[in-house]
Every structure is written in structure tokens, then in C-alpha cells.
Amino acid sequence: MKLLGDSSSSLLLSLLLAQLHLLASAFPAHPRRIQTDFDKLSNQTRHLLKLTQDLLKNPVFATEIDHQRFKSLPAISSRVSDLTTLEFKPTLSQLYADLKSFEHHFEWLNRTTRKQQHSSVPKLTDMISHIKSLINSLQRQMTRAEAPRIPVPSPSLPPNPAFHWEVVQSSQELLQQFRLFCDWASRVFLTLKSKLPA
């Protein structure tokens, strides 16, 4: 009986040691997986940047605009020095809030261009789809990091444009601001990745 008890204890100890070994070997891979996720976030943002740049190549946007129709677009801080002072959780939360704001603005623009039967409708629909995908990816990282969600206020949108040139100006302003955001956000994601444990 004693021999049986000793054998059972040895077997249990062996199983526990095996499980601990598996956990220990799996843990170092976790930071690498998170780093890969941040590469994905940066790549998704760069893809959105390219979509925005392609839309802005349209000759209709060649004219400079000097007034602001959108009062609630996120303020973009694009100083290189700001990258060195980023805090992980607050930055994720702010990027999420900014993306949600741009999503609301682009959905408004998409509805407006549909009414005007504008040629950019298919590309705007594609862009909104990619924005939603980036938001979902960012949400997953926020959940892992336990980053809080900042309340996103309802956007202050301009009146529905009555003329084609108003649609053009609204599109141009929104795309130019989003181009700045995407360029900044892609740098931010790479900076945050560098702050992760190796």
C-alpha cells in the first residue's frame, strides 16, 4: 500500500512539473505575439494611409481649401518629440477614440456622397470597412492591456451639402485630416511596440 501511495505521489509530482514546464516554455512567446499584433496594427494603418492618398490623387482635389467644415475632428499631434513621451494605455485609448470619431465622420460623408451619386462612393465604403477592421484589432489590444475606453462624443457635423463643390470640399478636408492621422498613428504603433518587453 505504501509503495502504491509513493507511486501515486511521484506520478502527480511528475504531471505538475510537466505542466509547469509547458507554461514556462509558452510564456516567452506571449510578448512576441503581442509585438506581431502591433506590426499588424501598423500595417493596417499604412494601408488606410495608402487608400487615403489614392483618393486625394483625384484631380478634383487639386484646389486648396481654406475653411473648416468639420469642427469635431481629432486634433493630430505630429511632432516627433511627442513619440518619446507616449504612455501605453492612455495612447491606445486615445487612438481608439480618434478612430471612432473618424469612422463617424466618414459614415456621414459616405451617406452624403451616395445622395449626390459621387464617384468616390465605392472607395469610401472600402475605407470605412478597413477603419472598422482596425478598430476591432485595436479593441483586442486594449482588452489585453486593460486600457480604458474614452467616451466618444457625437461629432459636430456640417449641414448636408446642397452643391457638388461642397461635397468635394468636405471630402478633401476629411481625407487630408485622416491622412495626417494615419501617418501619425502608424508611427505611434511602432513606438508602442518598442516599449513592449522583448
Labelled PLM ranges:
Residues 30-58, 64, 89-198:
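Extracellular/luminal segments of secreted precursors and ectodomains of membrane proteins
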Residues 2-84:
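Leu/Val/Ala/Ile-rich N-terminal alpha-helices, chiefly Sec-type signal peptides and the beginnings
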